[in-house]
Amino acid sequence: MTAILERRESTSLWGRFCNWITSTENRLYIGWFGVLMIPTLLTATSVFIIAFIAAPPVDIDGIREPVSGSLLYGNNIISGAIIPTSAAIGLHFYPIWEAASVDEWLYNGGPYELIVLHFLLGVACYMGREWELSFRLGMRPWIAVAYSAPVAAATAVFLIYPIGQGSFSDGMPLGISGTFNFMIVFQAEHNILMHPFHMLGVAGVFGGSLFSAMHGSLVTSSLIRETTENESANEGYKFGQEEETYNIVAAHGYFGRLIFQYASFNNSRSLHFFLAAWPVVGIWFTALGISTMAFNLNGFNFNQSVVDSQGRVINTWADIINRANLGMEVMHERNAHNFPLDLAALEVPYLNG
């Protein structure tokens, strides 16, 4: 006699909901992190689109001089941005119900806080969803670990830096030219180009691009021929095939002779781990650098560090960078400062009569 045991299906509405949320058979996996990710990212995206098109000018510096950022107020795709929350609000939590009216909320840049906080929560949940799906499929968790690098970078720019500087008005504007403005001001105030963690980030991003191009070109150049001259080489691969699609020995031999033997990986697994780890670690360091500079632990300062035997300064590139930083800083928020600090130290000429 054969007994057939079947798993008892939950008949409750909550049970069916749980099964649907955690099912890996859905076209798109939702997961418990997705329950929070979907509404937060939809909210951030919707408010961003509406504000980018139609938001009124924002008093970013808190001096009653609003700055326009939306398309309907004279901007284009390049110059448009979501203007950060006003310096008058600082780090205060500023939802719509904290303002006297919607007009006041818009004037003080409330949409920026709403978008940024929902966005950060959403991308963090996306990272958790990657881990959750990997766990349910029996995969290793490194996809979520790799994604933690851009999550850390976004958190550093949109949350940690404003906290360190004391106001959301110091956060990065959500737009193309606003991003460039943020970068220039960051250099002027923190000398980020001379910070070792930023240098590691540059090495990670550009090095990752180089290694990706090298790997892709090596693989493409050492494909195992499965097609004729008149067919695309891509037709020689069938999704899910067990056979190797390229000759790693040939790629290893080529690269080893091009540079030297030990510069080439002979293990496909360690190679792909390296390709993932290099840019991720670099971006981690950049996020850490932004987070330290948020509290004014700035880049190295070698200004006027080289002098001759008479004590006279021999200008170096560090001094050139310093002059550029001063120029950028005095142009920043020029209407907010009656006496820019870099100019206030100059002696005022005495006029007789």
From Swiss-Prot:
Q: Which PROSITE patterns match?
A: REACTION_CENTER (PS00244)
- Site Stabilizes free radical intermediate: list residues: 190
Quaternary state and partners of this protein?
PSII is composed of 1 copy each of membrane proteins PsbA, PsbB, PsbC, PsbD, PsbE, PsbF, PsbH, PsbI, PsbJ, PsbK, PsbL, PsbM, PsbT, PsbX, PsbY, PsbZ, Psb30/Ycf12, at least 3 peripheral proteins of the oxygen-evolving complex and a large number of cofactors. It forms dimeric complexes.
The primary location reported for this protein is plastid
Using the record's annotations, give every residue carrying the modification Phosphothreonine.
2
Q: What species was this sequence derived from?
A: Zea mays
Other known facts:
2 of the reaction center chlorophylls (ChlD1 and ChlD2) are entirely coordinated by water. Herbicides such as atrazine, BNT, diuron or ioxynil bind in the Q(B) binding site and block subsequent electron transfer.
Instruction: List the residues marked with site Cleavage.
Output: 344-345
Q: Name one GO cellular component term.
A: photosystem II
Q: Know the name of this protein?
A: Photosystem II protein D1
Q: Which residues bind a quinone?
A: 215, 264-265
Q: Where does [CaMn4O5] cluster bind?
A: 170, 189, 332-333, 342, 344
The residues the record assigns to binding chlorophyll a ChlzD1 are 118
Which residues are annotated as site, described as Tyrosine radical intermediate? 161
Cofactor binding note of this UniProt entry: The D1/D2 heterodimer binds P680, chlorophylls that are the primary electron donor of PSII, and subsequent electron acceptors. It shares a non-heme iron and each subunit binds pheophytin, quinone, additional chlorophylls, carotenoids and lipids. D1 provides most of the ligands for the Mn4-Ca-O5 cluster of the oxygen-evolving complex (OEC). There is also a Cl(-1) ion associated with D1 and D2, which is required for oxygen evolution. The PSII complex binds additional chlorophylls, carotenoids and specific lipids.
Q: Where does pheophytin a bind?
A: 126
Compartment(s) of residence: Plastid, Chloroplast thylakoid membrane
